[in-house]
Amino acid sequence: MSALPQAAPAASAHHDVLAIRALIAKHKRWDYIFGLLGLLALMVGVLTFAALFAEMAIQGIPRLNPDFFTNFPSRRPEQAGILSAWVGSTLVMIVTAIVAVPLGVGAGVYLEEYGSKNWVTDIIEINITNLAGVPSIVYGLLALGLFVYQFGFGQSILSAGLTLALLILPVVIVATREAIRGIPRSIREGSYALGATQWQTVKDHILPYSSAGILTGVIIGMARAIGETAPIITIGALTFIAFLPASPVTATPPFLSFEWLFSPFSVMPIQMFNWTSRPEAAFHQNAAAAGFVLVLMTLAMNGLAIWLRYRLRKNLKW
């Protein structure tokens, strides 16, 4: 008689164990399915990029030779090159970096370390986030009215650099803030405990420890800017240019010239756009070669960001 009451709880416990095991097995199946779907989505993106990159490589590599990098554009596709385009891209990126990096890093540091948390900073943060999603051609329209006409910079390298600096500024600000947020509070408290001022703490501790994340954001932003076409076309960049801007370096004191800032220019995406609009297949091959070079430059910049982040984080420990 006493065995019956004991058997009932044992059977109930066994049933509960089986139910839990079935639930765990179900969750594992869903985990497996979700992981498989994620891998499939990743492979679609990677394979699509690989196919496009391979197509550009197959078409463009035969055109890659020293003359392609040292010749100006030409009506004859076999003689055309990207000299003015890659020089223009380089100079525009220099202006972009000089403007965007100090402003972006400074704004990020202020918002995280100095700015009070109130409705004003909340509005600023929301606007920064929204600016990151604004179509690039809107920046081009803004630059056309402001830099080209209002400030009188004209259709120049300076206007292009300032336009792209505005474009990547939200990226640099967000990257700076995220990097600073990752620093433990104990770093700041230890610095203040030793009598350091807020500026000394930022200069000697916050910025060095967050440099990996900041550099990553800056390089990724620059990699985006180098491939932009819409804002550069909007401000009036040339699609055909057979001369180089004035040299930034001179043979006489002060050995620096800023005339190049106001020179007409072209960049690699616009040169590609010009070639793809031509009916001749040889120009399309030139566009593929220029695209291959541009993708390699972008991959190199992203690879540099990953390497710098790894090296800096390896050397900085807390």
Each model region followed by its residue ranges:
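Transmembrane alpha-helical segments of polytopic membrane transport and secretion proteins
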Residues: 1-42, 306-318
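Periplasmic/extracellular loop-to-transmembrane helix junction in inner-membrane transport proteins
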Residues: 17-40, 54-96, 117, 274-285
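Interhelical loop and adjacent transmembrane-helix boundary motif
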Residues: 73-76, 80, 232-295
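Hydrophobic alpha-helical transmembrane segments of multipass integral membrane proteins
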Residues: 87, 91-99, 103, 107, ...
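Transmembrane-helix boundary motif in ABC transporter permease subunits
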Residues: 96-128, 141, 149, 305-314
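Transmembrane alpha-helices
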Residues: 97, 175, 198-236
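Amphipathic cytosolic juxtamembrane alpha-helices at the membrane-cytosol interface
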Residues: 111, 116-120, 125, 188, ...
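Generic hydrophobic transmembrane alpha-helix motif, especially the helices
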Residues: 129-166
